Amino acid sequence: MSAREGAAPVVVAEGLGRRFGQLDAVRDLSLEIEDRQIFGFLGPNGAGKTTTIKMLCGLLRPTGGHARVVGFDVTSQHAQIKRHTGYMAQTFSLYPDLTVEENFRFFAGVYGVYGRAAAHRMDELFAQIELDELRGLQAGRLSGGMKQRLGLACALVHRPRLVFLDEPTAGVDPAQRQRVWNFLYALCDAGTALFVTTHYLDEAERCHAVGFMLDGRLIARGTPASMRGQLQDRVVGVEARQAVDAMRALRGVPGVDDVTIHGHELRVFFARPVDAGTVAESLRVAATRAGAPLGRVYPLAPTLEDLFMTYSRRGTAAR
């Protein structure tokens, strides 16, 4: 879904940072997120993703730089940001002793939605997210997937222009994950921008744009296709029955950046673009010397997981 014609970006951050004592949790982050876009925010634990979300929501004051969210300054216009954004935390943050309906009505009141407007919005969202039959159940008794759905409904009660979702499908089974994503696409089609953190790389492929955080820095961003393109012609697949021995041998081949195991297939990463047919001989020689002869050698299309692992490996090596 493309942005509304002439619409300003929903997030504009320039040099944003947050320091806790001697720790730079987020450093010099500059970012734009377009209207009506699903933006995937990736990175390992401790990379600064949640800290970034809290700053953009106005929940945590930056110690450097500045940002505007839906047109409002994050340091001085918290109330305006709250009225136009929703936030769903990574952990279940609703009231377990209240029913599903009571939780929704409570958050509706927090956002200034009362009476018939709240009832109408609840009917609308509960039908879409399949919570209708659970209205009277205590929230603490819901399954993980249903808790996530209720949290999402509460974040949407006031029809926000932008919603921050911190790991919205964590701990949810694949079928429930698919339902959540179907709903997120429908939200985006209806005009809501989404800022999503996730550890699931297949989910990142569903986003219109993604950014990768490492050690508090945004080190790459773009469309999933453009991000994968950074590894184009640099990933080669190898069949190996003795996968562990072959992996160790291939890591010593000049030009090889890393090797990972996927069953009887090895994914061989090169520092520069290569032709699989050209490098096959050097790979076979190294593996045969180690007593782990190879089967087929073939080019592989890179994935976001490949890129994620490459960035993480470089970050670890740089420390």
For the regions a language model picked out, list residue spans one by one.
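Conserved ABC ATPase "signature" region
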Residues: 105, 109, 114-134
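Hydrophobic anchor residue at the start of the ABC signature
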Residues: 152
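Conserved catalytic motifs of ABC-family nucleotide-binding domains
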Residues: 159
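Catalytic Walker B motif of ABC-type/P-loop ATPase nucleotide-binding domains
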Residues: 163-166
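Short, charged/small-residue-rich alpha-helical element at the C-terminal edge
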Residues: 232-314
